């Protein structure tokens, strides 16, 4: 199995040695002789400090020029002495073991400067470096994050201008990856929010990715899940986050082992342009003398970890099957109106787990029906939508097992003329022509015949379920069978099926649809496209059961009333801020008795739809919640996503109200889905002047005062306490029991790791660009966040003022796919 995860190193060397003359790093061993050659990439700066000095002098000259002799700023391209990566032997074609390069773009630039000339200088330097990288065949470049977040929009503007330049987007496109810590203790989603702001400014550009510096402390599960759905191209692993085991070898703590395994499991799905994920080690030379094995021990450990992860994933047959196919977004199938291809049937028939479950259901159903079967009055079994006959095969197997060959009559109905030919061949070769084949649409079968001439069936078996359960018209198709061909004791397999939705963040899904101009109002089937479910629960939206009507309560078949149209209002509570790109859909089905299949994610908490059955139950709320899992190793269905035309952002402790409708129109002869969204927050307000209320409702999230409190407070993960988040995953299971003796160095934050990657701890900022000595990355800047009006303090107000809970609407979407204008299913 190929995991698409590679290993890179940033060699330890002194940048100053390149400032006077060229000293190319033709191999890392010349600078780190302790390193073995078992790595795939070398991370090096594109240019040397010498180039920085040249550019600085050019900028000084530009600032000194007079108005009369003014000329636009011209930044020279780097010369031979100004580059770290040689213009030759970047990739030796005759030696696949030679590592490739990942480039570091200049980190001394101030892309967010308020001085337009400084920003212009930065952009021109980046374009020069990108031009050289393209020439020597480097396609992945890592960029330093902004230094001052109060000017983040200026930074994003320059990044987008860089991405829009032909030097970057011309095929094969370059990948620009912004380096950031995976999370901060004080605000775990702060770096994700930074990334999301820049990414949105750049309109989800496919060439923009993220490189994450692994933390030293355990990552909260909701933060990790958010990043797993993002286009992460590099994991930056500092030697400072390693511990030493009982043998003094460097090892990662178990939570970081699992973190890497989870990214390994994503398996390159997040790489839109096919760029593989790379784990980059850096700072190994700092602590080489403190561990056994020196620098090479770090590299050998990471390689061991990835190989172990490959074995774990390779042992999962379902994961192996998924790896055989590329990630893709597909329109839902319409088997009722379109004829499926032979290759589609073949793919579905490979899912032995599904057919094993069907076989078990058929066995139990025939055992229940057996007492009324005889040679004079054989049981009639209908396989509705037989396709190429896999369910007929399983039915014959059960009949032989129960010795009911003479007591059963089998009918297979299929409208696809090509599949019908296949059934004819199977009937002759395998079924001894004992199956009655009917080439017709099941919704029209014998509907014009007198009732006494219609075939009545005892068992109806079908596999008409789509990714959302009802989205391939199973209710409509089986209703025709029920109405015209069933009696009171007819058994249907499946007996019922439910549809479920949950709000998700899936930036790659949104990016792919946006870049290909595909409809954001139509539902899509997603295969191996990462997503993050934002709510704590998945909601059941509706359920269909068969039989759909009780015949013994109806005198005339024309009196049957069945609700094919369904609507559901769903409430979701979302604890952590984020952005919604749509709703993901799953289904579960009860085939017969206690035999179920499910496409819900493992360990899902499901809120069942409120029904009349629960109305009289005094403990109905408890009975509406249950745990569900995905049927192990079942591969027939991928999830369906109902997208939003515009992503919607929300803050911590938000509530969503989602309308999901299934519309069946006999007038227009089609079925379609419509959906929309509203978001809310709850505020706890004191009942005093409206001016104070209005002011308190506009306080930014990051400003917390004594006068403003939300109903549910933000809960931050803190490294200074031993508190663990309630919903945090315990990642310590199923990992080798390694005794860790402690960290190798003093505490190093994720931001320091990012600075180390870019060499910012060694070089000072040029004084001609900014004379103010401020931090490299100022995450605590709140210039733009200070409230303009000071609120009155509680001591100035009346005591014991009653509090009011206010539900405030924060956003609303349009109604999507109105009247089926983007997607519908013909009846």
UniProtKB/Swiss-Prot annotation:
Instruction: Name the active site residues.
Output: 463 (proton donor/acceptor), 472 (proton donor/acceptor)
Q: Which residues carry this modification: Phosphothreonine?
A: 614
Q: Which UniProt keywords apply?
A: Cell cycle, Cell division, Methyltransferase, Mitosis, Phosphoprotein, S-adenosyl-L-methionine, Transferase
* Primary location: other
Changes after translation: Phosphorylated in a cell cycle-dependent manner.
Give the UniProt subcellular location, in the record's own words.
Bud neck
Q: Name one GO cellular component term.
A: nucleus
- Site Critical for specifying symmetric addition of methyl groups: list residues: 348
Q: What is the effect of changing residue 387 to A?
A: Almost completely abolishes catalytic activity
- Report the EC number(s), separated by commas if there are several: 2.1.1.320
Q: Which PANTHER family match?
A: PROTEIN ARGININE N-METHYLTRANSFERASE 5
Q: Which family does it belong to?
A: Belongs to the class I-like SAM-binding methyltransferase superfamily. Protein arginine N-methyltransferase family.
Record text on subunit structure and interactions: Interacts with HSL1 and SWE1. Interacts with the amino-terminal regulatory domain of STE20.
Functional summary from the UniProt entry: S-adenosyl-L-methionine-dependent protein-arginine N-methyltransferase that can catalyze both the mono- and symmetric (type II) dimethylation of the guanidino nitrogens of arginine residues in target proteins. Involved in the control of the cell cycle at the G2/M (mitosis) transition. Cooperates with HSL1 to hyperphosphorylate SWE1, thereby targeting SWE1 for polyubiquitination and subsequent degradation. Acts as a negative regulator of the filamentous growth-signaling pathway through inhibition of STE20.
Q: Quote the record's miscellaneous comment.
A: Present with 1180 molecules/cell in log phase SD medium.
The entry's protein name is Protein arginine N-methyltransferase HSL7
Q: What is the lineage of its organism?
A: Eukaryota, Fungi, Dikarya, Ascomycota, Saccharomycotina
